[in-house]
């Protein structure tokens, strides 16, 4: 199986790539969980290179269409994109595996590093270990910005939208959701009034480069499991509510509402719904709650946690796992003999309640998005 898996990236440009088994996809998503450095830009670039260019599991048009949806959702867009593609290829179980493996290695790594940090105080040593990674991470981000920009900004109008968005967010401090909604409105109207400009497949030069036929190609019919059905939407909503409510109810019944575990779960549920614009946009909210309101971490520990989050694989918002571990450990919520266990449980709870909404957004909204992949009003950037 290892030979089969490794042969997949070397698909020739001619002909369609072979079907991807669930096991092949499993090993890819596991690998991605360990190499997804560089924040969302770097992670999306890795997925584009592996899934669009090398393996051709999905065409660029369908990849960008899925990415457009993930960009307007709260939560980590790279992880949501992995869930979306995994779901498109292998139904619900594919999405669950892709999204879980995207986060799980980072959770284990951060639990281990958080324990070393709080138990031994060897942050300089940890920083030294990861210091050499930082230039590579920077290079990945710069390369990702160039790759995505050169392929998405295909004419002067789209460059103007990008420039206006840049000025709005950096010079005028316009909230990120308003920028995204504004760009979406321009794309929607442009797709109706000037389709030749806003067509995703348009453009000139290198932007029109084809990577060959893909498993999920531009005109591949939507698979049966991805067709929108009301009963499926209701089913996902009910299951999602159940997966949130049962752990929360158990925490309240076991520990009470004011316990650290319960308060962390409730706080990071709210934080998960506010993460428009990525981790940096929600960090002030997390800082205010974790440092000022609940005392789960100090200001210095928050900064150190962000440094660890930036130099480990996985979404940058995984810094919340560090906050959870520190809070559970310092508060000794399971007693002085179980400090590590308290930290690990807190980190796991925080991760569960932070990322659960992402799975629900994709599994519930994915069929609606798939129904628009050939509709110019919704594919226009």
Question: Where are each of the predicted segments found?
Answer:
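Multi-pass membrane proteins that catalyze or facilitate reactions on polyprenyl-/lipid-phosphate substrates
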Residues: 1-73, 84-312, 316-380
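GIY-YIG nuclease signature motif recognition
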Residues: 80
């Amino acid at each position: 199986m290892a030979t089969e898996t490794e042969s997949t990236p070397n698909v020739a440009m001619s002909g369609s790539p072979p079907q991807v088994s669930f096991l092949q996809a499993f090993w890819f998503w596991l690998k991605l969980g360990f190499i997804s450095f560089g924040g969302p830009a770097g992670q999306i670039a890795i997925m584009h290179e592996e899934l669009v260019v090398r393996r051709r599991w999905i065409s660029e048009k369908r990849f960008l269409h899925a990415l457009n949806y993930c960009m307007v959702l709260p939560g980590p867009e790279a992880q949501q994109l992995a869930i979306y593609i995994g779901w498109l290829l292998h139904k619900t179980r594919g999405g669950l595996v892709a999204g879980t493996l995207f986060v799980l290695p980072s959770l284990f790594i951060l639990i281990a590093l958080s324990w070393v940090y709080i138990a031994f105080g060897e942050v300089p040593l940890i920083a030294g270990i990861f210091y050499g990674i930082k230039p590579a991470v920077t290079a990945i981000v710069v390369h990702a910005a160039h790759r995505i920009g050169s392929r998405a900004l295909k004419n002067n109008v789209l460059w103007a939208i990008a420039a206006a968005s840049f000025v709005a967010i950096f010079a005028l401090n316009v909230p990120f959701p308003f920028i995204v909604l504004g760009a979406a409105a321009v794309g929607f109207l442009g797709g109706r009034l000037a389709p030749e400009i806003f067509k995703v497949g348009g453009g000139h030069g290198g932007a029109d480069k084809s990577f060959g036929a893909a498993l999920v190609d531009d005109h591949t019919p939507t698979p049966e499991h991805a067709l929108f059905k009301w009963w499926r939407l209701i089913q996902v909503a009910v299951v999602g509510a159940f997966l949130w409510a049962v752990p929360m109810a158990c925490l309240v019944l076991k520990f009470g509402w004011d316990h650290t575990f319960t308060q962390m779960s409730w706080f990071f549920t709210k934080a998960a719904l506010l993460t428009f614009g990525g981790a940096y946009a929600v960090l002030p909210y997390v800082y205010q709650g974790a440092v000022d309101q609940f005392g789960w971490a100090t200001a210095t520990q928050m900064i150190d946690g962000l440094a660890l989050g930036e130099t480990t694989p996985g979404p940058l918002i995984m810094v919340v796992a560090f906050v959870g571990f520190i809070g559970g450990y310092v508060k000794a919520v399971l007693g002085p003999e179980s400090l590590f266990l308290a930290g690990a449980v807190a980190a796991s709870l925080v991760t569960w309640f932070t990322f659960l909404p992402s799975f629900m957004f994709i599994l519930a909204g994915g069929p609606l998005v798939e129904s628009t992949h050939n509709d110019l009003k919704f594919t226009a950037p």
